[in-house]
Amino acid sequence: MSSNKARAVVGALVVVVAVVLLVVLKGNNNGDAANTDGGKLQTIVVRNAKPVGGIRQLTYNKGEQILFKVESDVADEVHMHGYDIMKDVKAGGSVTFDFPATIEGVFEAELEGRKEQILEMTVNP
Amino acid sequence: MSLLHALPLAHALVARKDLPIPAWLFAWAASIVLIVSFFALSAAWREPRFEEEHWRPIRARLSRDLLGMPAQLLCGAIGVFLLGVAVYAGIHGTEAPDRNFTITFLFVTTWLGFPLFSVLLGNVFKPFNPWRAIGRTVGGGFRVLAGQRSAHLPYPERLGRWPAAIGLLAFVWLEIVYGANGGVSVGLEPHAAAVAALLYTLYTLAMMVLFGVEEWCERGEIFSVYFGMLSRLGCFGVSEGRLGRRRPLSAATKWATVPGSAAVVIASISATSFDGAQDGAFKNGIEHTFHWFVDRGVGLAGALHITDTIFMALTFLGVAAVYLIGVRGMSTVQGAPPAKKLRSGFAHTLIPIAFAYLVAHYFSLFVYQEQAQFTYLLSDPLGTATTNLFGTASAGIDFKVISANAIWYVQVGALVVGHVLGLTLAHDRATAYWGDYRQAARSQYWMLAVMVAFTCFGLYLLSVANA
């Protein structure tokens, strides 16, 4: 009998720990869906064939409009992977990307010729 | 960070990376795992149920057709042909990994496809194994010409499956460390993959000459051992030359009787863990170590290879340590068999965990890349835009086929199911080893801790992927 009691206690403890874990982690999750880059024009500046300030991170929710401009001092092709959009940019010129966030996931944009990543884009559901 | 990006970046094989699982899902999954584990302990059975296979043959005609010589010849020929195509495309095709047949065929279609089909349909790699097909054909030819069987050296029993375990680590090292130019999943170049396939062919055929075809496939041939291990989970198997059905999981209980088997399954878990962690959980550690080597004058590529190798080795040791601690704990329970018997006796309980890790980490890659495999990679295997064999050379991958939510549920579902199956096997083995079911249940607190550790680690890896 006592071993059954011990089991009941351990079982109750496990459930309590699980519920606490759930509540704590669930609480953390609210809020990160609100602040996205949706619909705002973002500019990625490329100097010496590298993105200024490192690889740019942009976050969207599915259905929002993705809008960013690449200003580059080198001529190359900007490739938005996953969405598979490619646009040429001239040295000293700029190119604008404007498309809806239809595919969820994490995607890269790079200077295709140089294999230089300039953007990491996250689209949340 | 900046230094890592000074390295030439290879194209990631797949353009869409998985989103990390959200915290609420992590919490749900972890909670379910804890609760299920607890009830598994208290409500469990007292007599072993999986030690016997309860094997029943399927219809004799169907079995004969599937296992007969014509089918064996056909499957073997297909295997040899596809290996040939992969080597040819690797050597003569483009060096862009995502456009060349070779990389996707070897590292996605074969490496991830056979585990799936092995679990569902049984040991399907065996008939398609190109090296076994070549070995048996040559052996058969020798028998006809010389009128006697070829003599082989006796395989050293103590080596067991260690060659396969080491080979498995070497294969994954080749896939994600050797070719990794800045942390992409499959950074290996097609030419290198083709050369590696040729070298492995030579090595395998040499070992088959030494020890015999079936002997080497059972112990040392990486892919036979690995896919064969996973096929033990399913309900189809061959016994005495006949195909039959058995109780699912039951064949796994007899798998780890050969030395080194635990190392194979630990190698599998650690390889998948390392691949999942290098871009997420280990990212900071890898960067830190990488800079440490660079500051001491090691070249960039060399520093990255050394760092990745160290982290991969540490992952293997870490996974092994968790398992060995569990074994050690069990050996303190009254009536425990010797530690050596425990060590090999519970190794098979990790097979479902290994498969769950595989599904969780590569499910989406498989879904995307198989679209490429059966469209443009089939029509234009060299990736040079010179052929369009089936008219599908200009097709692309539809990344919309699975939503982020669907991927998350598959990932978490795989880990939870793998956890339950692992616990099931462990509990069942304990009831076989401990006559007294109370002691058996007590020993299982240790295996429960091991399984919870692996499952929560797996969930953790998914929750920080690409962070």
Where are the regions that the model predicts?
Chain A
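N-terminal Sec-pathway targeting helices
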Residues: 2-13
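Extracellular/periplasmic metallocenter environments
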Residues: 7, 21-39, 89-125
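N-terminal edge beta-strand
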Residues: 35-65
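Beta-strand-rich interaction surfaces with strong enrichment in secreted/lumenal proteins
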Residues: 56-58, 84-88
